[in-house]
């Protein structure tokens, strides 16, 4: 994902803090502890950490460059030498094979972190105290990007052949609420408030959605088309006379 606008260093944005009471979170102790530590840091420091890891001159780009040039002999793979235990060594080696395959230095290989919970992937990618090697963090980052990409593809599909956007704005808010503070730090200032305003407008037009499950959980079970076709089962109430009046004013 391309780095977005930086948050103002002088502004304290409460939306960066993790709210454990919002739906859709798979809160492990490790994830909560990481989120708590990051919440105590200023936004400017979080942005610096994000840039050092994922920026254009960050560790992941450096690793990719070395893998293309040197393959298995890349200097950034030296931390594998300190691993002990067959299980740890095996996982790291699978991550190496995946990364080498991505850079055409080996046949393509499966990502060993594919299918993990987003929160668990975040703990590997963004926790500097983690015992995982750089190449494992890289592979986990790729799994995280794939996870988010698949989610957004499904979310965008709910906007096809319909004028209303309640599902997509619910989904955008849900995704943002799941992010670690370091991930939120590169979003535009007041991003959440803007998306909430869009959702409020949509629900004024079409009625409030009452969801007993997160959008992500629904999209794991049902197709975007199914959600659109069954919106009425999630609607609290719709005053169609009022909707018609609002839409008439908008047309004018």
Task: Give the predicted meaning of each segment.
Residues 1-252:
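Type III/flagellar secretion export determinants
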């Amino acid at each position: 994902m391309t780095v977005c606008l930086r948050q103002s260093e002088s502004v304290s944005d409460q939306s960066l803090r993790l709210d454990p009471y919002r739906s859709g979170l798979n809160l492990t102790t490790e994830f909560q502890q990481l989120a708590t530590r990051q919440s105590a840091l200023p936004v400017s420091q979080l942005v610096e950490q994000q840039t050092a890891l994922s920026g254009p001159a960050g560790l992941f780009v450096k690793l990719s460059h070395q893998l293309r040039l040197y393959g298995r002999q890349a200097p950034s793979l030296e931390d594998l030498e300190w691993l002990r235990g067959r299980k740890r060594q095996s996982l790291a080696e699978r991550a190496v094979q995946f990364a080498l395959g991505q850079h055409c230095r080996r046949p393509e290989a499966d990502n060993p972190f594919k299918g993990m919970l987003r929160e668990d992937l975040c703990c590997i990618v963004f926790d500097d105290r983690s015992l995982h090697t750089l190449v494992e963090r890289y592979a986990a980052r790729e799994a995280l990007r794939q996870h988010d990409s698949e989610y957004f593809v499904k979310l965008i599909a709910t906007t096809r052949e319909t004028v209303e956007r309640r599902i997509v704005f619910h989904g955008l808010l849900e995704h943002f609420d799941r992010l670690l503070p370091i991930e939120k730090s590169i979003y535009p200032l007041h991003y959440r408030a803007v998306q909430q305003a869009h959702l409020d407008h949509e629900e004024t037009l079409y009625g409030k959605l009452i969801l007993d499950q997160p959008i992500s959980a629904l999209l794991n079970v049902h197709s975007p088309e199914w959600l659109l076709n069954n919106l009425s089962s999630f609607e609290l109430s719709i005053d169609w006379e009022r909707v018609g009046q609002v839409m008439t004013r908008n047309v004018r």
